[in-house]
């Protein structure tokens, strides 16, 4: 049974401007493990990665019904990749399955999250 759906879209240019304007923006959005991956990427790929993670975390927060705010921060949500490269939300929730999709175009990154109750 689906218990939550969230979607978010961001402009790559906006994320790039925020990265250049404020060094702490990266620290605010990414967890330590996500940053390890981020800093190994090319400049273009860094923007796509950060924008995709930003959108996925926003989508997840919408799917759980809170949005990003006082109850859920960007650091409470970690988006990694499985062995096949598929994005996954690292979560302690054992009674639900979380589906994540991230896509990029020339100008945008978009992410959708669906939370499914297993029992």
From Swiss-Prot:
Keyword Metal-binding found: yes
EC number per UniProt: 2.7.8.7
GO terms under cellular component: cytosol
Alphabetized NCBIfam families for the sequence: acpS (TIGR00516), pantethn_trn (TIGR00556)
Role according to the record: Transfers the 4'-phosphopantetheine moiety from coenzyme A to a Ser of acyl-carrier-protein.
Molecular function as annotated in GO: holo-[acyl-carrier-protein] synthase activity; magnesium ion binding
Record's subcellular location: Cytoplasm
Residues holding Mg(2+): 8, 58
Broad class of where this protein is predominantly found: cytoplasm
Reaction(s) catalysed by this chain's protein: apo-[ACP] + CoA = holo-[ACP] + adenosine 3',5'-bisphosphate + H(+)
Biological process according to GO: fatty acid biosynthetic process; lysine biosynthetic process via aminoadipic acid
SUPFAM superfamilies per UniProt: 4'-phosphopantetheinyl transferase (SSF56214)
Protein name as catalogued: Holo-[acyl-carrier-protein] synthase
Family according to the record: Belongs to the P-Pant transferase superfamily. AcpS family.
Keywords noted in UniProt: Cytoplasm, Fatty acid biosynthesis, Fatty acid metabolism, Lipid biosynthesis, Lipid metabolism, Magnesium, Metal-binding, Transferase
Cofactor: Mg(2+)
InterPro entries: 4-PPantetheinyl_Trfase_dom, 4-PPantetheinyl_Trfase_dom_sf, ACPS, P-Pant_transferase_sf, Ppantetheine-prot_Trfase_dom
């Amino acid at each position: 049974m689906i218990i939550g759906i969230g979607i978010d879209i961001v402009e790559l240019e906006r994320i790039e401007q925020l990265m250049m304007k404020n060094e702490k923006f990266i620290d605010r959005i990414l967890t330590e493990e996500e940053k390890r991956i981020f800093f190994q990427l090319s400049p273009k790929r860094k923007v796509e990665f950060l924008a995709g993670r930003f959108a996925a975390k926003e989508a997840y927060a919408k799917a759980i019904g809170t949005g990003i705010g006082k109850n859920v921060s960007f650091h409470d949500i970690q988006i990694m990749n499985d062995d096949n490269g598929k994005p996954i939300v690292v979560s302690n929730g054992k009674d639900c399955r979380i589906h994540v999709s991230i896509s990029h175009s020339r100008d945008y990154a978009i992410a959708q999250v669906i939370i499914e109750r297993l029992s």
